[in-house]
Each structure stands twice: as C-alpha cells, then as structure tokens.
C-alpha cells in the first residue's frame, strides 16, 4: 500500500523490541541437517545435554547446537529483513532489543546478539528513567557502539529517558546525553511528543518533550549541540585501547533452558560486565568484540587490526569455555607483540571438544605459563613485603600475557604500616602494560582525576576526542 513512498518518503523502518526466541530452543529438521553437516555427528542422542549436565560433552553439544541455531536465525530472519530494506533503498534500524544490560538475556532472546545486530543499518538501545550522572545504560550503549564500530556502520542510536517524569530538566537531558555520546552513541531520539492533551492519560513514560515544557523556547540550543556532536562522532574510525572478548561461547555452554543459566553462567555475566565498567570508568576505552571479528583480525607490530580498528590489548573476561580458533588467534596476537590479559577464570573447555580440552590447556600454557586457573600459584615478594597476584609471561617477539586471578573491582585499604600491596585492579594492570590513549597529568587515572569518560574518533588525519566529566 505504501510502495510509492519508498524510499523517497519512507527512508527506513525502525523496529522496537523484536521478539524472537523468548528463551525457547528451536528444533527443526533443517537445524538437525545443518548441525550434522557441520559437526559430523547426530545430535539427537545428546540433546538431553541442553537441559542437564552430561559431563564433559555438555559444553560441546550446547555450543555447537546453539551456534547452528543462531546461524539459521541469521540466515532466515536477521539478514533477510535487512536485505529486504536495502533492496528498496531503506535502512533497517533498532533502538530497542530485549535482554537489556544482560549477556544472558541477550542470548536467550536472540541466540547470538551480534548475529542479529550486525544486520541493522542503525543499531541502538533504550535508556529509560532518571539516574545520577554516570548511571545511564552503560552495557547496552557500549554493545550498540561496538557493533557500529566492528561492522562499519555510521550510526548507533538511543531512545532515551522515558519514565524520567515531566519534571526532567534540560540540565539532566544534556548531562545524560553527553554521557551516552561518551559511550559511543551518536544519534539522539527522544521517546515521544504527544500533541493531544489526552495523550498523557495513556502515556506511561513521560516526559513529552515539546511545546508544553517551559524549556521549549530554548530547545533549539540543545538540538544544535546534539546535531553538531552527532555529525562529528558519526565520522571516522573509533580508537580504543582494548578489545574485550564477548564471552558468548561461555554463555552458550551454561545455558540450561529459557532464562535459566548455571551459576557459572551468572558469574561470567556479572564479572564480565563489572570488568567492562571498571576499565571504562578508569579511563580505558574498549569495544566488545565477537568471535567472528576477532578471528578475522590481523596482527602487526603488537597491534590487533580488525578492518580499520586497532587495539593494543585483548582482554579475556572470566570464561568457562572458548572457541579453539579464538584462543589460537589470541595466542598469535601475543606472539606478534601484543598484550593479552585474562581475568579471574581461564577457560577449561572448548566449543569443539567440551570440558577439559587438552588443546585449550596447551594453548593456555603457551600463553600464561599455566594450563588452568586452578594451577596458578602467586608469589610473595619477601624483600619488599609486598604481594603481587599478577602473573606475567613474555614472548621473544615483545608480547606479554598477563593473568589476574582475583582482580579488585574496588580498592582496599591496608592498615598495617609494614605491609604493602600491589593494586591488582585490571585498569591498573592495563595502564602499566601499555601506553594508554588518554591519560591524566600527574600520573593519576582519569577516575582519580574526576570521573572523566571519553571516546576517540580518528577522522582522516584528525583526532577527535569527546570527554565528559561525570
């Protein structure tokens, strides 16, 4: 009915909160055929392992089944929707997906959040409610901007501040927006403007940002600021210190059914998200990186190149399970002069062979000098009365592999004057290992200097930094 308006009038379609799996596990003949062709065995005798622990084989059947399921979702739903719009000169976009602020939620809704989001021409997320500065939807914003950077999109959008009340001020509006832009977003979308007075009767997510507000006469000042900022930050290539591996394989290996995950899966998410926020708020920017893009990367002079992106550190969050080719790529980065840092728990299993995979133990030994987290022994420096829990192994090619068995997400104060302790939070370890992109004068971290968030775009020969003081 509207074909004559495409694409001149209708330039795109923006989906809101698409439902796909809702925790359901797909079973179909086409999925079985796909699984058998890729993995060369019949999964049916092992499908009980999707719901119950069946030993070392558990991780293998879960990872391979969910990978095949996610691939078919991408080929039959996520990509065709994008292709349909592109063939008609339109953009396919989102500003709201389910599983908010949660790796586990993203997975049980979509199987693989990267396989879905990489087909949006504009990706994005919601950011509702009223918070203090520094309290916006960090994890969702960083995921949206990471997909934009990895898959070479121009825009990452936000649908913002609904539910914050009609009393939301312009001071709050600009502070929250600057924070989101520091996370890498670059397209502002307020939630709604209701022109009928009865609209507020049904509208449960105020404010309605338009002529009813006392700041309406000054609204153009805000939009000019956002327009300029959006125009600048939608250009060029993102520059960040760290590629933070998104631990999808570990999430798949610990997915039981619906929204149920093992305790180990909960730890993967909670510690992984805390790690991401801890390094960012300490002044170290990152992109979440999926297995596909990491395996496409090349290494040159200690730099990991993913297309035009460049990273000096690969950060492995706590993991139970990893793809063998992913760990081999990380090892190649280490041998090529790069810095690899693993935190809290080294993976013991692989997607290809399940738990206790000898190849994973071999690769970990070559990287960190230990085959598993349980084999780590820290060294007490008796001459300095200091305790360093960080283990570092160096390669002849200049690379370094660092294992932090129990990072501190908050500083501890030690009252014994005869005892000193190395600060083992991950941001301090990164800061000591590389020359950071952004530093504060006086040798302090950005968080110590005043909670300064930042993002960096390289636009041709120009370096553009956007800094936000929380």
List PLM regions with ranges.
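Carbohydrate-binding surfaces of carbohydrate-active enzymes
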Residues: 2-12, 16-470
